[in-house]
């Protein structure tokens, strides 16, 4: 709740935000995910913030870094060139994640953030498969990971089924097999669906002069060993 004023300054999609500004109701990053991403960066003060899949999240991250006076480096891994994102990132890797040299992710340190928002599909040599089998097990203790479009502990909702997303099943297997290493922090969808938990952050929505999406799909976890 301490960053409510910062959230109030975010424009709605009807207010003609600049190309580099985050905005509510953007169709890709729901309100709760924007709030939690900003808060995570402000609280953790990471040296590096790495995105596998960039866009609205990059704009939120840049806003948090700028307003909180941080020196966090933004590293964007995304195959789609976009001038507005390139202007916000310190390091730009414009190739599919599975074809990129991602060895540097092993050097991420405590409180660094790895924000994953990729194809969400576990297929042979897909970016999601490569992330879970070649990256996640090699991350150092203390690294914070966000995986987007995850609905755990629930299954994918009906309205998502025609997208054929499957990565949350891989995530669930990691959590069930080694909960001591992969510690859940904030499951946004569960938070938004639980009446008691959702009431805790209701003052944020009441302070924003727009109708904002209160749900989210970010699943935050921390590497504990």
Annotate the PLM regions.
Residues 1-67, 71-146, 150-225:
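A short alpha-helical cap/connector motif
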């Amino acid at each position: 709740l301490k960053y409510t004023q910062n959230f109030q300054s975010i424009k709605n999609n009807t207010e003609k935000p600049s190309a580099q500004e985050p905005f509510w109701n953007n169709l890709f990053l729901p309100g709760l995910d924007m709030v939690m991403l900003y808060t995570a960066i402000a609280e953790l003060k990471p040296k590096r913030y790495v995105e596998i899949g960039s866009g609205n999240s990059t704009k939120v991250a840049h806003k948090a870094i700028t307003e909180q006076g941080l020196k966090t480096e933004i590293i964007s891994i995304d195959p789609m060139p976009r001038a507005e994102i390139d202007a916000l990132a310190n390091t730009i890797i414009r190739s599919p994640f599975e074809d990129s040299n991602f060895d540097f992710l092993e050097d991420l340190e405590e409180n660094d953030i790895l924000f994953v928002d990729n194809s969400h599909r576990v297929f042979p040599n897909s970016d999601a498969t490569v992330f879970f089998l070649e990256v996640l097990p090699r991350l150092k203790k203390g690294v914070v990971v966000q995986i987007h479009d995850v609905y755990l502990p629930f299954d994918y909702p009906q309205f998502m089924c025609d997208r054929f997303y499957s990565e949350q099943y891989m995530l669930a297997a990691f959590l069930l097999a080694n909960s001591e290493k992969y510690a859940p922090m904030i499951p946004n969808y569960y938070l938004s669906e639980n009446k008691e938990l959702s009431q805790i952050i209701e003052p944020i929505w009441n302070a924003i002069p727009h109708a904002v999406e209160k749900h989210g799909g970010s699943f935050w976890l921390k590497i504990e060993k």
